[in-house]
Amino acid sequence: MASGVQVADEVCRIFYDMKVRKCSTPEEIKKRKKAVIFCLSADKKCIVVEEGKEILVGDVGVTITDPFKHFVGMLPEKDCRYALYDASFETKESRKEELMFFLWAPEQAPLKSKMIYASSKDAIKKKFPGIKHEYQANGPEDLNRTSIAEKLGGSLIVAFEGSPV
């Protein structure tokens, strides 16, 4: 079911910047986004970047000790959101970084909000080609390291964001 909701150009630009890793200076790397949260505009017609809801790579280890915990804390308790998270994890063979797309639809969110976000999900996903990992979370219990590691590769994952799973 399509909702007719549009996706802002800035959302597409942020996705591209997160997906494409260029050879960058240390300063440019610090400005790269680790996580970004998207919401519907006030008129509910466009998916936009939620103001102030991002984590920069340069903040990790400086002002943010646990980026995933901080990311989960940025999600509203009683409304839906979309998010991109640049997950860093280790398998038994190697260290990887891959983008994850989240639909956050908590149980306490209004039914209308859940319906609009669910029906608009395809619109934003079409703007994010190549996303390997998509995850819908309905509460904080769905956003723990174990469930995310399971989604990323199950028993092959030994650490997520530097912490063992």
From Swiss-Prot:
One annotated Gene Ontology cellular component of this protein: glutamatergic synapse
Segments carrying motif Nuclear localization signal: 30-34
Alphabetical list of SUPFAM superfamilies matching this protein: Actin depolymerizing proteins
Protein name (Swiss-Prot/TrEMBL): Destrin
Domain named ADF-H: residues: 4-153
Similarity field: Belongs to the actin-binding proteins ADF family.
The protein's role, per its UniProt record: Actin-depolymerizing protein. Severs actin filaments (F-actin) and binds to actin monomers (G-actin). Acts in a pH-independent manner.
Organism: Rattus norvegicus (Rat)
Domain of life, per lineage: Eukaryota
Record's comment on post-translational modification: ISGylated.
Keywords for the protein's UniProt record, in alphabetical order: Acetylation, Actin-binding, Phosphoprotein, Ubl conjugation
Residues recorded with modification Phosphoserine: 3
N6-acetyllysine found at: 19
InterPro entries per the UniProt record, alphabetical: ADF-H, ADF-H/Gelsolin-like_dom_sf, ADF/Cofilin
GO molecular function, one term: actin filament binding
Keyword Ubl conjugation: yes
Keyword set includes Hydrolase: no
Modified residues (N-acetylalanine): 2
One BP term from GO: positive regulation of actin filament depolymerization
